[in-house]
Amino acid sequence: MIFRVNLLFSCFCFVLFVFDFSNASKYDQGSLNIAKRLWRDWEREANAKDMERKEVKADAEGNAQMERERRLWRDWEASQAKPLERRAWVEAVEASDQNEREKRLWRDWEGNQANDLERRAMEGLMEANEENQRAKRLWRNWEANHEYEIERKRDLPELKRRKRLWRNEDQEVACTTKCSCSDNEIFSKVDHELTTSETKRVPCCC
């Protein structure tokens, strides 16, 4: 009886053990599945974080590379711009010098033209003054000659009358003058009132 009880208890314990073992196996299997799922989730999250970190690193490296390329490009542009700027500055200075040279030449040419025109104007003025003086002198001479001619023509009858009277007087004086006619001498008298260069020769009447 006791043996049967022990056997039954042993069977019951065995059944409980088997039941517990099966439950434990089931529990362990569920725990394992949960652990595997958690591991997979962790790996997936870790992989995602790693990928994100790699992407961030790649983006940072890409940004750094892009910034480096931009800096190199700006440096290259600056290095290219400096010769261009220097060349433009040199060209601007040369253009300014050329412009100033052209202005100076233009001013010199204008000055020469002005001096030439002024000289010509002065020469023309002097020639005009000389011509004016010559014309005035000729006009005065003509007026003087004309007035002299008018006076001479106006006084010509009187002069002729006076000459005739003077000739008569000279004839009378000559006729009354005592002179020796043996040597055919000629009595001469210079009349300064009539003409200074005129010499009247009156024959001596004896």
Curated annotation (Swiss-Prot):
RLWRNWE repeats lie at residues 37-43, 71-77, 104-110, 137-143, 164-170. It comes from the Eukaryota. It is found in: Secreted. Contains 3 disulfide bonds. The keyword Disulfide bond applies. Expressed by the venom gland. Keywords: Disulfide bond, Repeat, Secreted, Signal, Toxin. The keyword Iron-sulfur does not apply. Its main location: secreted. GO terms for molecular function: toxin activity. GO terms for cellular component: extracellular region. Residues 1-24 form the signal peptide. Residues 25-164 form a propeptide. Belongs to the scoloptoxin-08 family. This is U-scoloptoxin(08)-Cw1a. It comes from Cormocephalus westwoodi (Westwood's green centipede).
